[in-house]
Amino acid sequence: NNDMDKIVEVDTAFHDMLYTASRNERLRSIINNLREQMTTIRGRSMSYPGRLVETMDEHRNLVEAIAAHDVERAQYAARIHLENAEHTLMRSLSEHLPQKKA
C-alpha cells in the first residue's frame, strides 16, 4: 500500500508538471478542485494488473513527443493515455461492483 501511495504521488507530480507547462490557469484550477477524487481514481487505476507498466510507457511516449515539439504526437499520446486509464478504471469498478442476481 505504501508503494502504491508513492506511485500515485509520483504520477500526480508528473501530471502537475504537465498542467503547469500548459500555462492554462483555468485547467490548473479545475484540476486542483478535483485533486482528491483524481488521487483516488489514479490509485484504483494504477493498482490494476499491468496498468503501472502501461502508464509508464504512455508517460514516456508523451514526454518524448513534447521534447520533440511534435504537437500531433503529443495530443495522440495524451488521448491514448486518457482512454486507457478510463478503460482500466471502468474494468476495475465493474469487477468490484456487486453482481445482480438473476
Spans of features found by a protein language model:
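Short loop-to-helix capping motifs
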Residues: N2, N24-E25, H69-D70
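Short, surface-exposed loop/turn segments at secondary-structure junctions
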Residues: M4-D5, M46
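Short, charge-rich, low-complexity alpha-helical interaction segments
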Residues: E25-N33
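Solenoid-repeat scaffolds in large eukaryotic assemblies
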Residues: K6-I7, A74
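C-terminal all-alpha effector/ligand-binding and dimerization domain
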Residues: H15, N32, E36-A102
